[in-house]
């Protein structure tokens, strides 16, 4: 389908959402300028680990260079409207007793490395607090796992896609957290 605005919605899962934040920037990265904000008007980040106590060097660099929703309308500066991007963060909130054995085994260490709390809430890999980027429209989906190996419903399950896609169709009203009901 042709986009009526000439721009696209970028969707990144896990670290892909963090890397797409870097793609939006027009500053050089490893000798190349991407300026993805000229092509996209929305960035959806699914279970993306934006913050962590033990973050990789690349993730730390993205957070230092492009803190929060850097190109959003909420940034109070003189950026031209063409450079503005809507950020939507989607976090799963998985009940670990109902999750896969892999999620039950990995989640405590992953959560501790990210937030410092092994009993945090999250999608089995990324805590909710890490997945919700400051300044973004935030969607928390109960019962949603990081990937298919973590639970039956994950960000790419058709019923779950419908849930987070609906957030894109709502008018942006600020840095809202939208908690959806359990995904069937």
Model-identified regions with their sequence ranges:
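Secondary-structure boundary motif
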Residues: 1-4, 29
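Gly/Ala-rich beta-loop-alpha elbow adjacent to hydrolase catalytic centers
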Residues: 12, 16, 20, 47
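Alpha/beta-hydrolase fold nucleophile elbow
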Residues: 3-13
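Helical cap/lid subdomain of alpha/beta-hydrolase-fold lipid enzymes
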Residues: 24-184
């Amino acid at each position: 389908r042709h986009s009526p605005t000439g721009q696209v919605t970028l969707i990144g899962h896990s670290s892909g959402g963090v890397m797409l934040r870097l793609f939006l920037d027009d500053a050089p990265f490893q000798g190349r300028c991407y300026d993805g904000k000229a092509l996209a008007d929305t960035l959806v980040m699914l279970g993306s680990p934006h913050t962590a106590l033990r973050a990789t060097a690349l993730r730390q660099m993205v957070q230092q260079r492009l803190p929060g929703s850097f190109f959003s309308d909420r940034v109070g500066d003189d950026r031209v409207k063409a450079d503005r991007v809507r950020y939507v963060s989607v976090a799963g909130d998985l009940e670990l007793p109902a999750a896969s054995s892999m999620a039950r085994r990995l989640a405590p260490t992953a959560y501790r490395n990210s937030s410092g709390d092994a009993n945090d809430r999250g999608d089995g890999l990324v805590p909710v607090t890490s997945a919700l980027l400051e300044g973004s429209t935030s969607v928390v989906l109960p019962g949603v796992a990081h990937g298919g190996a973590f639970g039956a419903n994950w960000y790419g399950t058709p019923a779950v896609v419908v849930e987070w896609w609906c957030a894109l169709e709502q008018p942006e009203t600020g840095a809202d957290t939208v908690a959806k009901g359990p995904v069937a």
